[in-house]
A protein has these predicted regions:
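Hydrophobic transmembrane alpha-helices of multi-pass small-molecule transport proteins
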Residues: 105-124, 264-283
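Helix-helix packing/entry segments at the starts of transmembrane helices
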Residues: 23, 80-85, 159-174, 220-254
Length: 292
C-alpha cells in the first residue's frame, strides 16, 4: 500500500481531496468486478452477512479517509508508522469484540507499543508549540490505526462466511456511491480548494488524470494481492514484510519530500515495530499450539 500512499501524497497539492478518494474507489471497480466474477461466476455478488459487510465498508472508508488526510498534513514515514500500530489496538479490542483472552506477554507488548506511539506523537512538544507537526494530522493517523483494528476484527469474522473478492467489490461500490453523492451535494470544497461539483477533474493535466487512474488500479491490486498473500504465505513472513513499510516510508519521505524524522520518532517507530512483531509471533505460536 506504500505505492498508493505515495501517489496520494504527491497529488495532494494538485487535486482536491475528495477527487483523490473518488478515484481510489471508482477506478478500482472494473478490476474487482473481473476478479469477483471469475472467482465466483454468477454468485460474485452473493453475501451471507450484510451487517458485517456494511460494517467492513464503514470502517474501511473511515480508515482510508483518515490515512489519506494525515498524509497531507504530517510526514510520510510518521503517518505510516502510526497507522501500522493497528496491531496494538487489535489486541486491545479483541477481548471485547471476539471474546479472546489476552495473556501477560501480549498485554506487555501492548503497553510497550503504546509507549512507542506516545514517543512518536510527542504531545509535550505539541502542547508547548515547539513542533511544526499538525496535531490534526497526528490525531487522524492514530485514529486510523484504531479504525483499522476494528476493520481487521470484522474481516476475521467475514473470512468465515464471505468471499474476499465479493466483500472488496461491495465495499468499493458502496463507498463510490457515497462519494458521488457527496460531490453532487457539496462540490469539491475540501482542504481549501474549490471545484465546480467535481467537473474540474475533467480539465486537469493529463499526468494528474493518469495518476488518479493508476491510483485506483493499484488500490484494487493491493486488495487482491493481500488476500492472496494471506492464503498462500505464512503469517510470520507477512508480518515481517508489513513492518518493513515503516523504514521504507521513512526512506522515501526523505528522498522525495526531504522529510527528516527526529530521533524520538525513530525510537518510537522501532518500539512500535518490536511490539507489533511480538504480538504477531505470539499469536502465531498460540495458533500452532492449539492445532497440535
Amino acid at each position: 500500500s506504500l505505492s498508493t500512499h505515495m501517489i496520494i501524497k504527491s497529488l495532494s497539492g494538485d487535486v482536491d481531496f475528495i477527487i483523490t478518494i473518488f478515484s481510489r474507489f471508482v477506478f478500482s471497480i472494473p478490476f474487482l468486478i473481473l476478479i469477483a466474477y471469475f472467482s465466483r461466476k454468477r454468485l460474485f455478488l452473493k453475501v451471507n452477512n450484510w451487517k458485517n459487510v456494511l460494517l467492513r465498508s464503514f470502517f474501511g472508508f473511515i480508515t482510508m479517509i483518515m490515512v489519506f488526510s494525515s498524509l497531507q498534513l504530517i510526514p510520510f514515514g510518521l503517518t505510516t508508522a502510526l497507522a501500522q500500530s493497528s496491531a496494538i489496538f487489535v489486541t486491545l479490542l479483541s477481548p471485547y469484540i471476539l471474546g479472546e483472552k489476552i495473556g501477560l506477554i501480549r498485554w506487555s507488548a501492548v503497553i510497550i507499543g503504546l509507549i512507542g506511539v506516545y514517543l512518536m506523537l510527542d504531545p509535550i512538544s505539541l502542547i508547548n508549540n515547539t513542533t511544526n507537526l499538525s496535531s490534526l494530522g497526528l490525531s487522524l493517523a492514530v485514529c486510523s490505526a484504531f479504525t483499522h483494528a476494528c476493520l481487521a476484527l470484522i474481516l476475521r469474522k467475514l473470512g468465515k462466511s464471505e468471499h474476499p473478492s465479493t466483500t472488496a467489490l461491495i465495499h468499493n461500490l458502496i463507498t463510490s456511491g457515497i462519494i458521488i453523492f457527496a460531490i453532487v451535494i457539496f462540490g469539491t470544497k475540501f482542504y481549501g480548494k474549490t471545484g465546480t461539483y467535481g467537473i474540474d477533474i475533467l480539465i486537469t493535466p493529463n499526468l494528474i488524470f493518469t495518476s488518479l487512474i493508476i491510483l485506483g488500479i493499484v488500490g484494487s491490486l493491493v486488495q487482491y494481492l493481500m488476500a492472496l498473500s494471506y492464503k498462500y504465505t505464512e503469517a510470520a513472513i507477512l508480518a515481517t514484510v508489513r513492518y518493513l513499510a515503516i523504514p521504507l516510508a521513512t526512506f522515501f519521505g526523505y528522498i522525495i519530500w526531504n522529510e527528516v524524522p527526529t530521533s524520538q520518532q525513530i525510537i518510537g517507530g522501532l518500539i512500535v515495530i518490536g511490539s507489533c512483531l511480538l504480538i504477531t509471533f505470539r499469536e502465531i505460536r498460540k495458533t500452532k499450539l492449539s492445532v497440535k
